[in-house]
Amino acid sequence: MELCAEYVSPDQRRSFVAGPHGTTDGVTTGPSAYVLNAGQVDRDRPAEARSVAGKVTYLGQLRNQLTGLQDDINEYLTLRMEAAKSKKLKTADEQRIEKEINTLLDGGDDEE
């Protein structure tokens, strides 16, 4: 069975497929480094996958894959948010520059 997820937005579509992630200790899940450095303990951290006779159980594999899939999706969405924020800042900066140019062209450079 292949574990997958799909992200759909008005301008983009992206499929995610779980790879052979070997841990339940996700990169983007759990408390932030700031919270941990402040002395908090991650009591909700999932246990590592259990094994029977040296082989990881089916549910353990599923949990590992879900953690990896969640990391992949979180990283992708974080990049999308950063790009949107950058675009918004660029647009605001362009509007400010255009307004300054129009003010100067209209002879408004003596105003203050």
From Swiss-Prot:
Gene Ontology biological-process annotations: cell wall mannoprotein biosynthetic process; positive regulation of transcription by RNA polymerase II; telomere maintenance via recombination; tRNA processing
Gene Ontology molecular function terms on file: chromatin DNA binding
Keywords linked to the UniProt accession: Activator, Chromosome, Nucleus, Telomere, Transcription, Transcription regulation, tRNA processing
Disulfide bond residue pairs: none
GO CC, one annotated term: chromatin
Compartments (UniProt record): Nucleus; Chromosome, Telomere
Presence of the UniProt keyword Transcription in the record: yes
Function: Component of the EKC/KEOPS complex that is required for the formation of a threonylcarbamoyl group on adenosine at position 37 (t(6)A37) in tRNAs that read codons beginning with adenine. The complex is probably involved in the transfer of the threonylcarbamoyl moiety of threonylcarbamoyl-AMP (TC-AMP) to the N6 group of A37. GON7 likely plays a supporting role to the catalytic subunit KAE1 in the complex. The EKC/KEOPS complex also promotes both telomere uncapping and telomere elongation. The complex is required for efficient recruitment of transcriptional coactivators.
Record-stated family: Belongs to the GON7 family.
Subunit structure: Component of the EKC/KEOPS complex composed of at least BUD32, CGI121, GON7, KAE1 and PCC1; the whole complex dimerizes.
Protein's name in the database: EKC/KEOPS complex subunit GON7
Source organism per UniProt: Candida glabrata (strain ATCC 2001 / BCRC 20586 / JCM 3761 / NBRC 0622 / NRRL Y-65 / CBS 138) (Yeast)
Gene from which this protein is expressed: GON7
